């Protein structure tokens, strides 16, 4: 009788141990499944927008004074809109509210202005006397009495003395580390100026200079990655790539064309760290070409192609990213 009671107690003990074990294992397994489900749900929430089509929304209109505009730009975080006028006035506006933040007079007439690659706050400005200046825009955030305040300013960080560049048909500028390279073209002739040990807040020193010629009249010119190449492009789509690793001995690496028979070049821009070129042609095609160098030499290969309803007139690239925007002749905008 004693043995029977002991066996019954042991059986009940095992029964409860088994039930508790099953419950704990079930809860643990359910928690693991729930955790995996949450992880996949989070990944889906993060990744899904990548596959969603982009859209464009109209923002606030800015109430600005009527002046001939040389350039409209926006800060990297999209908070401040800058307008550079041909009369040398720089205006900054809050993008969200359209409110004017600041205005400055550069004291010169602007012939043309564009960004210095790859920066988003330094501009190469050519005045009416064909002097090249470098203008910087700054947007500094301060907190006063727990209130966020944005202060915008414009200055000449490399000195106010301009660089005489003469009559030109194209220009590009590239600041790589502390090395500033300026390339200008006048018809077939290219002129390179290289400044070493460039530091903001100090004037430019003496430049190394070299000139050489392309095989055609140049309409567009771009400096390649790390100041190693120069792309020279003609109005009809001819292209030559020069190696400028040794500034005193530029070498022609490639010569060819960016258009097919029957096409004309309507727009182009460098992309992907300037290892590729995006080209728009008169039939509405937009082609991205990659530049490759190997033992066989240098070549251009088509990477991808898009078709627009009308020819592209201008491309706008996204800084440090692969995307770009195309504006066609009908005034429509396409994100790619």
How should these model regions be labeled?
Residues 66-74, 108-120, 157-174, 213-226, ...:
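Repeated scaffold domains used in trafficking and secretory/extracellular systems
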Residues 1-27, 53-75, 151-154, 158-160, ...:
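Transmembrane alpha-helical segments of polytopic membrane transport and secretion proteins
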Residues 49, 135-148, 194-202, 243-250, ...:
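Short loop/turn segments immediately following beta-strands, especially the blade-tip
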Residues 87-92, 129-136, 187-196, 236-243, ...:
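Structural motif
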Residues 58-64, 99-105, 154-163, 205-213, ...:
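A short beta-strand motif characteristic of beta-propeller blades
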Residues 77-79, 119-121, 178-180, 226-228, ...:
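Short coil/turn segments that connect the beta-strands within blades of beta-propeller domains
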Residues 24-32, 38, 45, 60-88, ...:
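Beta-strand-rich domains and repeat architectures in extracellular enzymes and scaffolds
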Residues 33, 81-85, 123-126, 181-185, ...:
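Conserved beta-strand element within WD40/beta-propeller blades
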């Amino acid at each position: 009788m004693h043995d029977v009671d002991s066996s019954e107690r042991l059986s009940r003990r095992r029964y409860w141990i088994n039930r508790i074990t099953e419950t704990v294992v079930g809860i643990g397994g359910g928690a693991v499944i729930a955790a995996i489900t949450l992880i996949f749900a989070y990944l889906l929430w993060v990744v899904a927008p990548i596959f969603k089509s982009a859209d464009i929304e109209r923002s606030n209109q800015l109430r600005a004074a009527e002046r001939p505009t040389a350039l409209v730009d926006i800060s990297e975080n999209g908070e401040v809109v800058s307008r550079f006028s041909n009369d040398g006035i720089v205006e900054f506006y809050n993008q969200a509210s359209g409110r004017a933040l600041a205005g400055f007079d550069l004291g010169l007439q602007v012939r043309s202005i564009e960004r210095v690659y790859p920066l988003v706050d330094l501009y190469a400005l050519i005045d009416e006397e064909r002097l090249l200046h470098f203008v910087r825009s700054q947007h500094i955030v301060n907190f006063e009495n727990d209130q966020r305040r944005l202060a915008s300013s414009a200055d000449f960080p490399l000195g106010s003395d301009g660089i005489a560049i003469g009559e030109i048909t194209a220009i590009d500028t590239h600041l790589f580390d502390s090395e500033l390279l300026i390339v200008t073209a006048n018809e077939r002739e290219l002129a390179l100026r290289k400044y070493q040990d460039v530091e903001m807040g100090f004037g430019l020193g003496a430049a190394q200079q070299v000139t050489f010629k392309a095989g055609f009249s140049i309409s567009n010119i771009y400096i390649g990655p790390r100041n190693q190449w120069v792309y020279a492009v003609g109005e009809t789509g001819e292209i030559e790539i020069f190696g400028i690793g040794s500034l005193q001995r530029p070498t022609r690496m490639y010569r060819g064309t960016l258009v097919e028979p029957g096409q004309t070049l309507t727009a182009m821009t460098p992309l992907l760290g300037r290892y590729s070129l995006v080209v728009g042609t008169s039939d509405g095609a937009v082609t991205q070409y990659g530049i490759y160098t190997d033992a066989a030499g240098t070549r251009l290969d088509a990477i991808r192609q898009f078709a627009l309803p009308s020819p592209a007139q201008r491309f706008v690239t996204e800084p440090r990213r692969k995307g770009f925007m195309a504006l066609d002749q009908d005034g429509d905008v396409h994100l790619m």
